[in-house]
Protein backbone atom coordinates (compact mmCIF):
# COMPACT_ATOMS: atom_id res chain seq x y z
CA UNK A 1 0.00 0.00 0.00
CA UNK A 2 1.18 3.51 -0.81
CA UNK A 3 0.00 6.65 1.02
CA UNK A 4 0.58 10.36 0.61
CA UNK A 5 0.24 12.33 3.84
CA UNK A 6 -0.28 16.07 4.06
CA UNK A 7 -0.01 17.96 7.35
CA UNK A 8 -1.54 21.38 7.96
CA UNK A 9 0.05 24.35 9.69
CA UNK A 10 -1.43 23.64 13.11
CA UNK A 11 0.03 20.12 12.92
CA UNK A 12 3.52 21.55 12.37
CA UNK A 13 3.48 24.68 14.52
CA UNK A 14 6.05 23.49 17.07
CA UNK A 15 8.59 20.78 17.82
CA UNK A 16 5.99 19.01 19.94
CA UNK A 17 3.63 18.88 16.96
CA UNK A 18 6.47 17.72 14.70
CA UNK A 19 7.04 14.78 17.05
CA UNK A 20 3.36 13.80 16.77
CA UNK A 21 3.66 13.94 12.99
CA UNK A 22 6.84 11.86 13.08
CA UNK A 23 5.12 9.19 15.16
CA UNK A 24 2.21 9.08 12.71
CA UNK A 25 4.48 8.69 9.68
CA UNK A 26 6.71 6.08 11.30
CA UNK A 27 3.69 4.07 12.44
CA UNK A 28 3.11 2.89 8.85
CA UNK A 29 5.78 2.27 6.22
CA UNK A 30 3.15 2.94 3.56
CA UNK A 31 3.25 6.68 4.45
CA UNK A 32 6.01 7.32 1.95
CA UNK A 33 5.37 10.82 0.64
CA UNK A 34 4.91 13.79 2.97
CA UNK A 35 3.54 17.24 2.09
CA UNK A 36 4.03 19.83 4.86
CA UNK A 37 2.48 23.25 5.29
CA UNK A 38 4.25 26.22 6.91
CA UNK A 39 4.10 26.43 10.72
CA UNK A 40 0.73 27.69 11.91
CA UNK A 41 -0.27 29.23 15.21
CA UNK A 42 1.09 27.68 18.42
CA UNK A 43 -1.60 29.47 20.44
CA UNK A 44 -4.57 31.71 19.61
CA UNK A 45 -2.67 35.02 19.79
CA UNK A 46 0.27 33.67 17.77
CA UNK A 47 1.10 34.61 14.17
CA UNK A 48 1.35 32.11 11.33
CA UNK A 49 4.77 31.98 9.68
CA UNK A 50 3.22 32.71 6.27
CA UNK A 51 1.84 35.99 7.64
CA UNK A 52 5.24 36.78 9.17
CA UNK A 53 6.82 36.25 5.76
CA UNK A 54 4.29 38.51 4.05
CA UNK A 55 5.03 41.23 6.62
CA UNK A 56 8.78 40.81 6.27
CA UNK A 57 8.64 41.01 2.48
CA UNK A 58 6.37 44.07 2.59
CA UNK A 59 9.04 45.84 4.64
CA UNK A 60 11.73 44.79 2.17
CA UNK A 61 9.63 45.93 -0.78
CA UNK A 62 9.15 49.34 0.84
CA UNK A 63 12.87 49.74 1.30
CA UNK A 64 12.67 49.33 5.08
CA UNK A 65 15.10 47.40 7.24
CA UNK A 66 13.63 43.89 7.52
CA UNK A 67 16.49 42.33 9.52
CA UNK A 68 14.53 41.95 12.76
CA UNK A 69 11.46 40.56 11.03
CA UNK A 70 13.52 37.94 9.21
CA UNK A 71 15.36 37.08 12.44
CA UNK A 72 12.02 36.48 14.19
CA UNK A 73 11.06 34.02 11.44
CA UNK A 74 14.41 32.27 11.74
CA UNK A 75 13.89 32.00 15.49
CA UNK A 76 10.58 30.19 14.93
CA UNK A 77 12.31 27.54 12.83
CA UNK A 78 15.32 27.32 15.13
CA UNK A 79 12.98 26.63 18.03
CA UNK A 80 11.58 23.64 16.12
CA UNK A 81 15.05 22.40 15.15
CA UNK A 82 16.32 22.65 18.73
CA UNK A 83 13.19 21.00 20.11
CA UNK A 84 13.72 18.05 17.78
CA UNK A 85 17.39 17.76 18.74
CA UNK A 86 18.53 18.04 15.12
CA UNK A 87 22.06 18.94 14.09
CA UNK A 88 20.76 20.89 11.15
CA UNK A 89 21.14 24.48 9.99
CA UNK A 90 19.02 26.76 7.83
CA UNK A 91 21.64 29.55 7.83
CA UNK A 92 22.42 29.24 4.11
CA UNK A 93 18.73 29.14 3.21
CA UNK A 94 18.01 32.28 5.21
CA UNK A 95 20.93 34.06 3.57
CA UNK A 96 19.45 33.22 0.15
CA UNK A 97 16.03 34.45 1.33
CA UNK A 98 17.55 37.70 2.65
CA UNK A 99 19.27 38.31 -0.70
CA UNK A 100 16.12 37.53 -2.71
CA UNK A 101 13.96 39.75 -0.51
CA UNK A 102 16.42 42.60 -1.06
CA UNK A 103 16.19 42.02 -4.80
CA UNK A 104 12.36 42.07 -4.69
CA UNK A 105 11.78 38.42 -5.57
CA UNK A 106 8.00 38.83 -5.19
CA UNK A 107 5.31 38.07 -2.62
CA UNK A 108 4.71 34.58 -4.03
CA UNK A 109 8.33 33.69 -3.42
CA UNK A 110 8.15 35.18 0.08
CA UNK A 111 5.01 33.25 1.06
CA UNK A 112 6.37 29.96 -0.31
CA UNK A 113 9.42 29.98 1.95
CA UNK A 114 7.31 28.87 4.92
CA UNK A 115 6.59 25.50 3.34
CA UNK A 116 10.06 25.27 1.79
CA UNK A 117 11.85 25.65 5.14
CA UNK A 118 9.42 23.41 7.01
CA UNK A 119 9.91 20.78 4.32
CA UNK A 120 13.66 20.87 4.83
CA UNK A 121 13.28 20.35 8.57
CA UNK A 122 10.77 17.55 8.03
CA UNK A 123 13.06 15.75 5.57
CA UNK A 124 15.98 15.98 8.00
CA UNK A 125 13.83 14.78 10.88
CA UNK A 126 12.45 11.76 9.01
CA UNK A 127 15.54 10.93 6.96
CA UNK A 128 13.50 11.33 3.76
CA UNK A 129 14.64 12.89 0.49
CA UNK A 130 13.70 16.57 0.08
CA UNK A 131 12.21 17.53 -3.29
CA UNK A 132 11.63 21.23 -3.89
CA UNK A 133 8.08 21.76 -5.19
CA UNK A 134 9.49 24.36 -7.60
CA UNK A 135 11.05 21.44 -9.50
CA UNK A 136 7.89 19.38 -9.89
CA UNK A 137 4.83 21.70 -9.77
CA UNK A 138 4.56 23.72 -12.95
CA UNK A 139 2.82 27.03 -13.72
CA UNK A 140 2.87 28.93 -17.02
CA UNK A 141 4.16 32.50 -17.33
CA UNK A 142 0.66 33.87 -16.66
CA UNK A 143 0.59 32.08 -13.32
CA UNK A 144 -1.92 29.44 -14.44
CA UNK A 145 -1.39 25.95 -13.08
CA UNK A 146 -0.42 23.30 -15.66
CA UNK A 147 -1.99 20.08 -14.48
CA UNK A 148 -0.82 17.51 -17.02
CA UNK A 149 2.71 18.88 -17.32
CA UNK A 150 2.99 18.80 -13.53
CA UNK A 151 1.75 15.22 -13.38
CA UNK A 152 4.33 14.12 -15.95
CA UNK A 153 7.25 15.86 -14.24
CA UNK A 154 6.20 14.80 -10.75
CA UNK A 155 5.54 11.17 -11.70
CA UNK A 156 8.99 10.82 -13.28
CA UNK A 157 10.74 12.48 -10.34
CA UNK A 158 8.94 10.64 -7.53
CA UNK A 159 9.34 7.28 -9.24
CA UNK A 160 13.00 7.50 -8.22
CA UNK A 161 12.25 8.34 -4.58
CA UNK A 162 11.27 5.65 -2.09
CA UNK A 163 10.38 8.28 0.51
CA UNK A 164 10.19 12.02 -0.03
CA UNK A 165 9.08 15.33 1.45
CA UNK A 166 7.54 17.75 -1.05
CA UNK A 167 6.58 21.19 0.37
CA UNK A 168 3.02 22.27 -0.28
CA UNK A 169 1.43 25.48 -1.57
CA UNK A 170 3.80 26.48 -4.39
CA UNK A 171 5.47 25.59 -7.65
CA UNK A 172 7.32 27.50 -10.35
CA UNK A 173 7.34 28.48 -14.00
CA UNK A 174 9.73 26.78 -16.40
CA UNK A 175 12.09 29.74 -15.90
CA UNK A 176 12.03 29.22 -12.12
CA UNK A 177 9.74 32.04 -10.98
CA UNK A 178 7.91 30.83 -7.86
CA UNK A 179 4.09 30.86 -8.02
CA UNK A 180 1.74 29.92 -5.17
CA UNK A 181 -1.71 28.40 -5.10
CA UNK A 182 -4.41 30.27 -3.19
CA UNK A 183 -4.25 30.18 0.62
CA UNK A 184 -4.57 26.60 1.88
CA UNK A 185 -3.03 25.33 -1.33
CA UNK A 186 -0.93 22.65 0.38
CA UNK A 187 -4.07 20.50 0.14
CA UNK A 188 -3.73 20.78 -3.64
CA UNK A 189 -0.06 19.77 -3.60
CA UNK A 190 -0.91 16.68 -1.56
CA UNK A 191 -3.57 15.75 -4.08
CA UNK A 192 -1.14 16.24 -6.99
CA UNK A 193 1.47 14.03 -5.32
CA UNK A 194 -1.14 11.33 -4.65
CA UNK A 195 -2.12 11.31 -8.32
CA UNK A 196 1.50 11.34 -9.50
CA UNK A 197 2.51 8.28 -7.47
CA UNK A 198 -0.86 6.55 -7.96
CA UNK A 199 -1.36 6.35 -4.20
CA UNK A 200 -3.87 4.02 -2.62
CA UNK A 201 -4.89 6.74 -0.15
CA UNK A 202 -4.35 10.46 0.40
CA UNK A 203 -4.34 11.26 4.12
CA UNK A 204 -4.93 14.91 4.94
CA UNK A 205 -3.99 15.56 8.58
CA UNK A 206 -5.35 18.63 10.31
CA UNK A 207 -6.62 19.68 13.75
CA UNK A 208 -10.13 18.23 13.46
CA UNK A 209 -11.30 14.61 13.21
CA UNK A 210 -12.75 14.92 9.73
CA UNK A 211 -15.81 16.75 8.48
CA UNK A 212 -18.60 17.57 10.88
CA UNK A 213 -22.27 17.34 9.94
CA UNK A 214 -22.74 21.02 10.79
CA UNK A 215 -20.55 24.02 11.57
CA UNK A 216 -19.35 23.54 15.18
CA UNK A 217 -19.46 27.31 15.67
CA UNK A 218 -23.24 27.06 15.25
CA UNK A 219 -24.00 23.53 16.47
CA UNK A 220 -22.01 22.66 19.57
CA UNK A 221 -20.86 19.05 19.67
CA UNK A 222 -21.72 18.40 16.03
CA UNK A 223 -21.16 14.76 15.08
CA UNK A 224 -18.57 13.81 12.48
CA UNK A 225 -19.18 12.34 9.03
CA UNK A 226 -17.70 8.85 8.60
CA UNK A 227 -17.95 8.56 4.81
CA UNK A 228 -18.80 11.18 2.20
CA UNK A 229 -18.78 11.05 -1.59
CA UNK A 230 -17.00 13.58 -3.78
CA UNK A 231 -20.36 14.84 -5.04
CA UNK A 232 -21.62 15.42 -1.51
CA UNK A 233 -18.38 17.14 -0.56
CA UNK A 234 -18.62 19.42 -3.59
CA UNK A 235 -22.14 20.48 -2.62
CA UNK A 236 -21.17 21.16 1.00
CA UNK A 237 -17.94 22.96 0.10
CA UNK A 238 -19.77 25.21 -2.34
CA UNK A 239 -22.13 26.27 0.44
CA UNK A 240 -19.39 27.15 2.86
CA UNK A 241 -18.21 23.95 4.59
CA UNK A 242 -14.42 24.04 4.83
CA UNK A 243 -11.76 21.60 5.95
CA UNK A 244 -10.22 20.82 2.58
CA UNK A 245 -9.30 23.22 -0.23
CA UNK A 246 -11.96 22.49 -2.86
CA UNK A 247 -9.42 22.43 -5.73
CA UNK A 248 -7.70 19.52 -3.97
CA UNK A 249 -10.59 17.23 -4.89
CA UNK A 250 -10.15 17.06 -8.65
CA UNK A 251 -6.69 15.42 -9.11
CA UNK A 252 -7.45 12.50 -6.78
CA UNK A 253 -11.04 12.14 -7.91
CA UNK A 254 -9.84 11.79 -11.49
CA UNK A 255 -7.42 9.08 -10.38
CA UNK A 256 -9.97 7.28 -8.18
CA UNK A 257 -7.96 7.87 -5.00
CA UNK A 258 -9.90 8.27 -1.73
CA UNK A 259 -9.07 11.04 0.76
CA UNK A 260 -8.99 10.47 4.51
CA UNK A 261 -9.30 13.59 6.71
CA UNK A 262 -7.51 12.81 10.00
CA UNK A 263 -6.65 14.58 13.26
CA UNK A 264 -2.96 14.92 14.16
CA UNK A 265 -3.89 15.43 17.82
CA UNK A 266 -6.17 12.36 17.87
CA UNK A 267 -4.55 9.88 15.46
CA UNK A 268 -6.71 6.99 16.67
CA UNK A 269 -9.84 8.70 15.30
CA UNK A 270 -10.85 7.29 11.91
CA UNK A 271 -11.78 10.71 10.56
CA UNK A 272 -13.77 11.15 7.37
CA UNK A 273 -13.25 9.05 4.24
CA UNK A 274 -14.01 10.80 0.94
CA UNK A 275 -14.79 8.40 -1.92
CA UNK A 276 -16.21 8.45 -5.43
CA UNK A 277 -19.09 6.16 -4.48
CA UNK A 278 -20.02 3.84 -1.64
CA UNK A 279 -22.55 1.12 -0.97
CA UNK A 280 -22.40 1.92 2.75
CA UNK A 281 -25.70 3.22 4.02
CA UNK A 282 -25.26 6.52 5.85
CA UNK A 283 -26.04 6.60 9.55
CA UNK A 284 -28.42 9.51 9.04
CA UNK A 285 -30.69 10.55 6.19
CA UNK A 286 -28.42 13.51 5.56
CA UNK A 287 -24.65 13.65 5.26
CA UNK A 288 -24.20 17.30 6.15
CA UNK A 289 -25.69 20.76 6.51
CA UNK A 290 -23.87 23.86 5.29
CA UNK A 291 -24.87 27.38 4.49
CA UNK A 292 -23.75 30.88 3.82
CA UNK A 293 -25.39 34.28 3.98
CA UNK A 294 -25.03 37.48 2.00
CA UNK A 295 -27.55 36.79 -0.77
CA UNK A 296 -30.18 38.93 -2.47
CA UNK A 297 -33.33 37.83 -4.33
CA UNK A 298 -34.78 39.56 -7.37
CA UNK A 299 -38.38 38.49 -8.06
CA UNK A 300 -39.75 39.31 -11.51
CA UNK A 301 -43.49 39.17 -12.19
CA UNK A 302 -45.25 39.30 -15.56
CA UNK A 303 -48.62 37.98 -16.68
CA UNK A 304 -48.36 35.11 -19.18
CA UNK A 305 -44.62 34.83 -18.54
CA UNK A 306 -44.72 31.09 -19.23
CA UNK A 307 -46.03 31.72 -22.75
CA UNK A 308 -43.31 34.18 -23.69
CA UNK A 309 -40.58 32.32 -25.57
CA UNK A 310 -37.07 33.24 -24.44
CA UNK A 311 -38.15 35.14 -21.32
CA UNK A 312 -35.68 33.45 -18.97
CA UNK A 313 -32.86 33.65 -21.48
CA UNK A 314 -33.33 37.41 -21.87
CA UNK A 315 -33.27 37.93 -18.10
CA UNK A 316 -30.20 35.74 -17.63
CA UNK A 317 -28.45 37.62 -20.43
CA UNK A 318 -28.80 40.84 -18.44
CA UNK A 319 -27.00 39.29 -15.48
CA UNK A 320 -24.31 37.83 -17.74
CA UNK A 321 -23.73 41.17 -19.45
CA UNK A 322 -23.14 42.73 -16.04
CA UNK A 323 -20.83 39.99 -14.82
CA UNK A 324 -23.10 38.72 -12.04
CA UNK A 325 -23.42 34.95 -11.62
CA UNK A 326 -26.71 33.37 -10.57
CA UNK A 327 -26.92 30.96 -7.64
CA UNK A 328 -30.51 29.67 -7.87
CA UNK A 329 -33.60 30.42 -9.91
CA UNK A 330 -36.91 29.04 -8.56
CA UNK A 331 -39.92 30.01 -10.68
CA UNK A 332 -43.70 29.92 -11.00
CA UNK A 333 -46.08 30.40 -13.92
CA UNK A 334 -45.89 34.19 -13.87
CA UNK A 335 -42.90 34.75 -11.58
CA UNK A 336 -39.22 33.95 -11.42
CA UNK A 337 -36.85 34.66 -8.56
CA UNK A 338 -33.13 34.98 -9.02
CA UNK A 339 -30.75 34.52 -6.10
CA UNK A 340 -27.37 36.24 -6.39
CA UNK A 341 -24.53 37.26 -4.11
CA UNK A 342 -25.60 40.55 -2.56
CA UNK A 343 -22.24 42.31 -2.84
CA UNK A 344 -21.88 41.50 -6.55
CA UNK A 345 -25.46 42.54 -7.29
CA UNK A 346 -25.28 45.84 -5.42
CA UNK A 347 -22.33 46.94 -7.55
CA UNK A 348 -24.50 46.71 -10.69
CA UNK A 349 -28.01 46.99 -9.22
CA UNK A 350 -29.28 49.91 -11.30
CA UNK A 351 -27.78 48.63 -14.56
CA UNK A 352 -29.34 45.19 -14.00
CA UNK A 353 -32.79 46.54 -13.14
CA UNK A 354 -32.75 48.84 -16.15
CA UNK A 355 -31.61 45.95 -18.33
CA UNK A 356 -34.44 43.69 -17.11
CA UNK A 357 -37.06 46.38 -17.76
CA UNK A 358 -35.71 46.90 -21.27
CA UNK A 359 -35.39 43.19 -22.06
CA UNK A 360 -38.74 41.79 -20.83
CA UNK A 361 -40.92 44.74 -19.69
CA UNK A 362 -42.03 43.09 -16.39
CA UNK A 363 -45.19 44.05 -14.51
CA UNK A 364 -43.30 44.25 -11.22
CA UNK A 365 -39.83 43.67 -9.75
CA UNK A 366 -39.31 43.08 -6.05
CA UNK A 367 -35.94 43.07 -4.28
CA UNK A 368 -35.06 41.38 -1.02
CA UNK A 369 -31.61 41.39 0.57
CA UNK A 370 -29.99 39.92 3.68
CA UNK A 371 -30.89 36.33 2.82
CA UNK A 372 -29.03 33.10 3.56
CA UNK A 373 -28.97 29.80 1.67
CA UNK A 374 -28.65 26.46 3.45
CA UNK A 375 -27.84 23.15 1.76
CA UNK A 376 -29.09 19.89 3.22
CA UNK A 377 -26.96 17.26 1.48
CA UNK A 378 -27.01 13.48 1.56
CA UNK A 379 -27.06 10.41 -0.67
CA UNK A 380 -29.53 8.88 1.79
CA UNK A 381 -32.20 11.41 0.83
CA UNK A 382 -32.88 9.66 -2.47
CA UNK A 383 -34.22 6.54 -0.76
CA UNK A 384 -36.02 8.35 2.06
CA UNK A 385 -39.57 9.65 1.80
CA UNK A 386 -40.62 12.90 3.42
CA UNK A 387 -37.25 14.67 3.60
CA UNK A 388 -38.62 17.99 2.33
CA UNK A 389 -41.56 17.64 4.71
CA UNK A 390 -39.20 17.22 7.66
CA UNK A 391 -37.29 20.33 6.57
CA UNK A 392 -40.47 22.42 6.51
CA UNK A 393 -41.60 20.93 9.81
CA UNK A 394 -38.30 21.70 11.55
CA UNK A 395 -38.21 25.27 10.30
CA UNK A 396 -41.88 25.92 11.05
CA UNK A 397 -41.42 24.59 14.59
CA UNK A 398 -38.53 27.06 14.99
CA UNK A 399 -40.79 29.88 13.68
CA UNK A 400 -38.63 30.33 10.58
CA UNK A 401 -40.19 31.34 7.27
CA UNK A 402 -38.82 29.61 4.17
CA UNK A 403 -38.12 32.09 1.38
CA UNK A 404 -37.15 29.51 -1.21
CA UNK A 405 -36.69 25.77 -1.63
CA UNK A 406 -34.88 24.12 -4.52
CA UNK A 407 -34.16 20.42 -5.02
CA UNK A 408 -31.81 19.09 -7.67
CA UNK A 409 -32.94 16.26 -9.92
CA UNK A 410 -30.23 14.02 -8.44
CA UNK A 411 -32.01 14.26 -5.06
CA UNK A 412 -28.59 14.72 -3.50
CA UNK A 413 -29.35 18.09 -1.99
CA UNK A 414 -32.11 20.51 -1.06
CA UNK A 415 -31.43 24.24 -0.83
CA UNK A 416 -33.57 26.46 1.38
CA UNK A 417 -33.47 30.23 1.61
CA UNK A 418 -34.13 32.02 4.90
CA UNK A 419 -33.66 35.48 6.35
CA UNK A 420 -30.16 36.31 7.58
CA UNK A 421 -31.47 36.69 11.13
CA UNK A 422 -32.82 33.11 11.01
CA UNK A 423 -29.68 31.55 9.54
CA UNK A 424 -28.10 30.01 12.66
CA UNK A 425 -31.40 28.93 14.21
CA UNK A 426 -32.36 27.25 10.94
CA UNK A 427 -29.17 25.17 10.91
CA UNK A 428 -29.72 24.19 14.55
CA UNK A 429 -33.33 23.17 13.82
CA UNK A 430 -32.32 21.08 10.80
CA UNK A 431 -29.52 19.38 12.73
CA UNK A 432 -31.92 18.54 15.54
CA UNK A 433 -34.55 16.92 13.32
CA UNK A 434 -32.14 14.96 11.10
CA UNK A 435 -29.48 13.98 13.63
CA UNK A 436 -30.56 14.32 17.24
CA UNK A 437 -34.06 12.90 16.77
CA UNK A 438 -32.70 10.01 14.69
CA UNK A 439 -30.43 8.62 17.40
Features from the language model and the residues they span:
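Glycine-rich beta-alpha junction loops
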Residues: 39-40, 208-210, 259, 263-268, ...
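Surface-exposed amphipathic alpha-helical tracts and adjacent flexible/coil segments at the periphery
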Residues: 244-246, 255, 265-272, 346-349
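Structural motif
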Residues: 2-3, 31-34, 128-129, 162-165, ...
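Short secondary-structure capping/turn micro-motifs that flank functional sites
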Residues: 41, 137-139, 210-211, 267-269, ...
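A conserved regulatory-domain signal marking ACT and ACT-like small-molecule sensing domains
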Residues: 270-439
